[in-house]
Amino acid sequence: MARILVGLSGGVDSSVAAALLVEQGHDVVGAYMKNWVNDEGIPGECPWEQDIQDALAVAKTTGIEFRVIDLVDEYRARIVNYLIEGYRAGYTPNPDVLCNREMKFGVFLDYALEQGFDYVATGHYARRMDTPQGAFILRGRDPNKDQSYFLSLMRPDQIARAVFPLGDLLKPEVRVLAEKYGLPTARKKDSQGICFIGQVKMSDFLRHYLPDKPGNIVDTEGRTLGTHNGLHLFTMGQRKGHGVASPREGVAYVVVGKDVRRNRLILGYEDASTRGLYASRAVVGGISNTLAPLPARVMAQPRYRAKAEWASCEYLEEGKVRLGFDTPLRALAVGQVCAFYDGGKLLGGGFFESIEP
């Protein structure tokens, strides 16, 4: 049996993960990663104190040791700064994906290894498979909860130390197990929002760090349609919130681009022919592969819950590929994470660096 440090978030998924590992006979210790404290007056609830109490109650119920690990400084340096600077530059960051590589299976894993643990376990709906060539990640059994996308930037050495007890379970089965084990989180609602920041709205979070920067809203021909308060408040494909009514009945205006240099938000019609809305090619960099270089044909998933689409894959240089999508993809954004699959097998992931029509 292994010595495993399980990340207890105070939610039902990590609670059941811990209970399963105890039932399997492992030497389990639970730890809450204290990554964020909303002490700067940002609107919204960040219930970390209640989450700690819930995690502690789970540890008592399962009979395991419980620790609170203060990672606030590391989280700010690795995740919050990445998020703020990405939006400042006009990108669309994905803190939840980076959080897994840098925090849960980065700083937290380093702590675990220093403390003599063999593995780190989380409540992700994903599976790990070991082969003679190394370990890789498979999609979770539950197609509605599969979270392998969020693990797509993990390095091979991190995957080898990861345990996902919920990978073969459906979400309803997890709820049933939580009741069976008598866990105090059995009926707790799933959390939403930015990784570890709770119910804080992204717009409120960004406004706290990035002051309004008014600019013009234009159409694809450069005609002025209105004004905006900051490019960081908008994302590609966004239909609402820009305040511009479409002159075409039944066809909405959507965000199709950002001109960062001139601080202009570009709108176009929700139409396949609109320049900038659909992409047939893209360059992906910062690639983290699990086992081997990407093949010439891959399935590319551009965001969580999006369908993975077939694409040609050409290496440009180390860590960068150009994708050619069989079917043009809607509203891709620089900075988003693209995950690569071979069926249900996760091959790795990277960041969109440029988008081509």
Swiss-Prot record:
<feature type="region of interest" description="Interaction with target base in tRNA">
    <location>
        <begin position="94"/>
        <end position="96"/>
    </location>
</feature>
<keyword id="KW-0808">Transferase</keyword>
<feature type="active site" description="Nucleophile">
    <location>
        <position position="99"/>
    </location>
</feature>
<dbReference type="Pfam" id="PF20259">
    <property type="entry name" value="tRNA_Me_trans_M"/>
</dbReference>
<keyword id="KW-1015">Disulfide bond</keyword>
<keyword id="KW-0547">Nucleotide-binding</keyword>
<dbReference type="Pfam" id="PF03054">
    <property type="entry name" value="tRNA_Me_trans"/>
</dbReference>
<dbReference type="GO" id="GO:0005737">
    <property type="term" value="C:cytoplasm"/>
</dbReference>
<dbReference type="InterPro" id="IPR004506">
    <property type="entry name" value="MnmA-like"/>
</dbReference>
<dbReference type="InterPro" id="IPR023382">
    <property type="entry name" value="MnmA-like_central_sf"/>
</dbReference>
<feature type="binding site">
    <location>
        <position position="123"/>
    </location>
    <ligand>
        <name>ATP</name>
    </ligand>
</feature>
<keyword id="KW-0067">ATP-binding</keyword>
<feature type="disulfide bond" description="Alternate">
    <location>
        <begin position="99"/>
        <end position="195"/>
    </location>
</feature>
<keyword id="KW-0820">tRNA-binding</keyword>
<feature type="active site" description="Cysteine persulfide intermediate">
    <location>
        <position position="195"/>
    </location>
</feature>
<dbReference type="GO" id="GO:0000049">
    <property type="term" value="F:tRNA binding"/>
</dbReference>
<dbReference type="InterPro" id="IPR046884">
    <property type="entry name" value="MnmA-like_central"/>
</dbReference>
<keyword id="KW-0694">RNA-binding</keyword>
<dbReference type="Pfam" id="PF20258">
    <property type="entry name" value="tRNA_Me_trans_C"/>
</dbReference>
<feature type="region of interest" description="Interaction with tRNA">
    <location>
        <begin position="303"/>
        <end position="304"/>
    </location>
</feature>
<keyword id="KW-0963">Cytoplasm</keyword>
<feature type="binding site">
    <location>
        <begin position="7"/>
        <end position="14"/>
    </location>
    <ligand>
        <name>ATP</name>
    </ligand>
</feature>
<dbReference type="InterPro" id="IPR014729">
    <property type="entry name" value="Rossmann-like_a/b/a_fold"/>
</dbReference>
<dbReference type="GO" id="GO:0005524">
    <property type="term" value="F:ATP binding"/>
</dbReference>
<feature type="site" description="Interaction with tRNA">
    <location>
        <position position="124"/>
    </location>
</feature>
<dbReference type="GO" id="GO:0002143">
    <property type="term" value="P:tRNA wobble position uridine thiolation"/>
</dbReference>
<protein>
    <recommendedName>
        <fullName>tRNA-specific 2-thiouridylase MnmA</fullName>
        <ecNumber>2.8.1.13</ecNumber>
    </recommendedName>
</protein>
<feature type="region of interest" description="Interaction with tRNA">
    <location>
        <begin position="145"/>
        <end position="147"/>
    </location>
</feature>
<comment type="function">
    <text>Catalyzes the 2-thiolation of uridine at the wobble position (U34) of tRNA, leading to the formation of s(2)U34.</text>
</comment>
<feature type="site" description="Interaction with tRNA">
    <location>
        <position position="336"/>
    </location>
</feature>
<dbReference type="GO" id="GO:0103016">
    <property type="term" value="F:tRNA-uridine 2-sulfurtransferase activity"/>
</dbReference>
<keyword id="KW-0819">tRNA processing</keyword>
<dbReference type="InterPro" id="IPR046885">
    <property type="entry name" value="MnmA-like_C"/>
</dbReference>
<feature type="binding site">
    <location>
        <position position="33"/>
    </location>
    <ligand>
        <name>ATP</name>
    </ligand>
</feature>
<comment type="similarity">
    <text>Belongs to the MnmA/TRMU family.</text>
</comment>
